[in-house]
UniProtKB/Swiss-Prot annotation:
ATP binds at residues 33-38, 55. This is Mitogen-activated protein kinase 8. One of its GO terms (biological process) is JNK cascade. The gene is mapk8. Activated by threonine and tyrosine phosphorylation. The modification Phosphothreonine is found at residue 183. Residues 26-321 form the Protein kinase domain. The lineage of its organism: Eukaryota, Metazoa, Chordata, Craniata, Vertebrata. GO terms for molecular function: ATP binding; JUN kinase activity; protein serine kinase activity; protein serine/threonine kinase activity. The modification Phosphotyrosine is found at residue 185. It is found in: Cytoplasm; Nucleus; Synapse. Its EC number is 2.7.11.24. Pfam families: Pkinase (PF00069).
Length: 384
């Protein structure tokens, strides 16, 4: 595309402390959130005739970690197609050459609120169990592609007023190091599983713990384990659930085990004490959902030893959840992620930049040709 024509397609607008340079089809930009990975605006898309969310990745090429994360997010968003994971509608950059390339914009479906806002609401059993069912469906879909999230939290889950739910991100890369004795940095750890906090090996049900913490917060209206760092996080967990068995301790590496074994021992509380009936909504006549079922599910999800914690599939079959069971949602075809080494490869910032630029150009080519993999036919007509 020639430079002048391309420049005419874009305009710049200040949004908060940032400048967005976007295609003219996107109007009425309003800031709706910001995080470590970027600033998000709502906008009206005149081509699709709908409201959308536009995320500007924040300084994606400032270092290898940022560049690698940007590449991973873009590649995964392009591949994943499930109703409980946010859908990618467009990708663009206003820059014209690889040398100039510095900004990446992702256009996504716009939702009404994140789960932090929903937690403050009085939810009945139907809504609570339906939201949990959708979280489990979305996570199962990621697991089918070999993506284990490890960092699910309310701020990264969005909902619409009709109670539909979508997961916004893909969590920690496989190579992201975590651990009890590591230098703390600013990040929400309240929902991270013990095996992540303690730097152990993990399996897919690491995400079941996070969903259990989110469910507990929806029931209680407050965070279950509000740790200030990994060590405090572990203390909060054992104060409530009790010190785990010696069998569990033997799975820890020596330095972590020494620390953990020297903590005071806690008996913990029963789930009846942690989640008394008074915290739950009234029993549901319609789907026969009860506080006792919800509490039973919590007691199976919030198990410190992952080998004794239920799996995503078992959670989906639990009486509190399986009233919504639909094979087309639970067993949706897995995403075709060809790059199995997505997290393992190491590149320089310049190499990551070139890989990301190629992905953006490939998207532009596909949209020009009316082919957007994994998107409904109506969206395949999008022109730049």
């Amino acid at each position: 595309m020639n430079r002048n024509k391309r420049e005419k397609e874009y305009y710049s607008i200040d949004v908060g402390d940032s400048t967005f340079t976007v295609l003219k089809r996107y109007q009425n930009l309003r800031p709706i959130g910001s995080g470590a990975q970027g600033i998000v605006c709502s906008a009206y898309d005149h081509v699709l005739d709908r409201n959308v969310a536009i995320k500007k990745l924040s300084r994606p090429f400032q270092n290898q970690t940022h560049a690698k994360r940007a590449y991973r997010e873009l590649v995964l968003m392009k591949c994943v197609n499930h109703k409980n994971i946010i859908g990618l509608l467009n990708v663009f950059t206003p820059q014209k050459t690889l040398e100039e390339f510095q900004d990446v914009y992702l256009v996504m479906e716009l939702m009404d609120a994140n789960l932090c806002q929903v937690i403050q609401m009085e939810l009945d059993h139907e809504r609570l169990s339906y939201l949990l069912y959708q979280m489990l469906c979305g996570i199962k879909h990621l697991h089918a592609a070999g993506i284990i999230h490890r960092d699910l939290k309310p701020s990264n889950i969005v909902v619409k007023s009709d109670c539909t739910l979508k997961i916004l991100d893909f969590g920690l890369a496989r190579t992201a190091a975590t651990g009890l004795l590591m230098t703390p940095y600013v990040v929400t750890r309240y929902y991270r599983a013990p095996e992540v906090i303690l730097g152990m090996g993990y399996q897919a049900n690491v995400d079941v713990w996070s969903i259990g913490c989110i469910m507990a917060e929806m029931v209680r209206g407050s965070v279950l384990f509000p740790g200030t760092d990994h060590i405090d996080q572990w203390n909060k967990v054992i104060e409530q659930l009790g010190t785990p068995s010696q069998e569990f301790m033997m799975k820890l590496n020596q330095s972590v085990r020494t620390y953990v074994e020297n903590r005071p021992r806690y008996a913990g509380y029963s789930f009846e004490k942690l989640f008394p009936d008074v915290l739950f909504p009234a029993d549901s006549d319609h789907n026969k959902l009860k506080a006792s079922q919800a509490r039973d599910l919590l007691s199976k999800m919030l198990v410190i030893d992952a080998s004794k914690r239920i799996s995503v599939d078992e959670a989906l079959q639990h009486p509190y959840i399986n009233v919504w069971y639909d094979p087309s949602e639970v067993e949706a075809p897995p995403p075709a992620i060809t790059d199995k080494q997505l997290d393992e490869r190491e590149h320089s910032v310049e190499e990551w930049k070139e890989l990301i630029y190629k992905e953006v150009l490939e998207w532009e080519e596909r949209t020009k040709n009316g082919v957007i993999r994994g998107q409904p036919a109506s969206l395949a007509q999008v022109q730049q």
